[in-house]
Amino acid sequence: MSMKPVVALIGRPNVGKSTIFNQMTKTRQALVADLSGLTRDRQYGDATYNNKSFVVIDTGGIGEADDGRGSIDDYMSAQSHTAIHEADILVFVVDARAGMIGADAEIGKMLHTLGKPVYLVANKIDGVHDAAPAEFYALGLGEPYPMTASHGRGIANLLDDLTADMPEDVEEEDQGGLKLAIIGRPNVGKSTLVNRMLGEERVVVYDMPGTTRDSIYIPFERNGKNYVLIDTAGVRRRGRIDEKVEKFSVIKALQAIKDANVVVAVIDAQEGIVDQDLHMLGYALDAGRAMVVAINKWDGLSEDKKEMIRIELDRRFNFIPYVKVHFISALHGTNVGNLYPSIHKAYASSMFKVSTNRLTQILEDAVAANPPPMSGGRRIKLRYAHLGGHNPPIIVIHGNQTGSLPKSYQRYLENEFRKVFNLEGTPLKVEFKLNTNPYAGKKTTSSKKLRPGVSEARQKRRNMKYKKGSHKK
């Protein structure tokens, strides 16, 4: 199983990188994640071209010094550095209207040192001389791809060549086990936990390399059950674990989360809960994945410190009250085995099945115990419910005026379904559909207005009788 290739768009500000990003992803909304506050202004999007999928990074821009001079370190922003090292392929975007300036030359020099494929794009060629892009030959990066990204011109030529060596999308075979993604910040103990889980309990383990992103899919067996462990940090051999050099990659984490059945989020007890931990949990929540939280490095903490962390958990994890939290020591193996029952419970909850009759009965019981509020002088009516999907489970409720149902009542219904089905470790989505009258807005076929209390069919017969009588002499 392989990860998608990663393409980074780099260049000075305002050369059109974001426009190319939107052209590649075919929408201005196709962000995998908005990483504000975590990785500054990088944006990640999914793209597919000629049945080949890849991830695009819009790096936001490499700054320009006031005097137009300076080393590449003066120009390069931190997020661009990270994106360049995450990427498999680099697209260097320059402004054909502005021509080549010092910053372009400095970036070009740096790109020569990376040993990665580089595609040079001369954007904004509309209205400039045909020979204008030629000056960028001096960068030594080959012939520029002329482009007017704002109108989509030239993008196909770039994508033809850029995706030429990418593998076509294929339906991957099931690995034959429950897929677990281990996620977390650097140095929280992900690799130690991975090796502990594989440790003495390993029966048959072999590494299945991903791409240059270093994510590895490792099948293993425990107590007769099969698993596939997705290690976003890369598995180190026993005795060679050095988490000080473990690198965090948003790309690897996001793709592992999407590919997993259950996410195990690792948090460092010694450092406490930080915003980046909440970002990672948010990614899993947005992806609808079942989840278990492991508070690592619990051994050795004072009782006062442990109590502080428990209070902090109650305060900051209130958006995922259904997630099971375990206090472990990956290094010593303390309570690591307790993760497995919670993993299986979370997965079973995410895949539960139930009949429409049973769901509707639970809905009726919930409504009888706590009726919906009035809206516009009328009681909101909820008719029936059915299951709309799995992982995460989706319950669809049909009724009238469902758009007026308060958020508090929606949460009430979600909690009722959770309680009845004992759903633990998985998000639950409750969607509401409006029952529509197929005859609403249509004119009646009768030539006369309906008399009060008279059905349309009876009125029609009366009208016909009246018409026949009117022709008699």
UniProtKB/Swiss-Prot annotation:
The UniProt record lists the keyword Ribonucleoprotein: no
Keyword vocabulary terms for this entry: GTP-binding, Nucleotide-binding, Repeat, Ribosome biogenesis
Residue numbers binding GTP 1: 11-18, 58-62, 123-126
Biased composition (Basic residues): 459-473
CDD domains, A to Z: EngA1, EngA2
Superkingdom of this protein's organism: Bacteria
Claim: Repeat is one of the keywords in the record: yes
Binding positions (GTP 2): 184-191, 231-235, 296-299
Record-level GO BP terms: ribosome biogenesis
InterPro entries membership: G_ENGA (IPR031166), GTP-bd (IPR006073), GTPase_Der (IPR016484), KH_dom-like (IPR032859), KH_dom-like_a/b (IPR015946), P-loop_NTPase (IPR027417), Small_GTP-bd (IPR005225)
HAMAP family (UniProt xref): GTPase_Der
Family: Belongs to the TRAFAC class TrmE-Era-EngA-EngB-Septin-like GTPase superfamily. EngA (Der) GTPase family.
Function according to Swiss-Prot or TrEMBL: GTPase that plays an essential role in the late steps of ribosome biogenesis.
Protein name in the entry: GTPase Der
Organism: Psychrobacter sp. (strain PRwf-1)
Lineage, broadest ranks: Bacteria, Pseudomonadati, Pseudomonadota, Gammaproteobacteria, Moraxellales
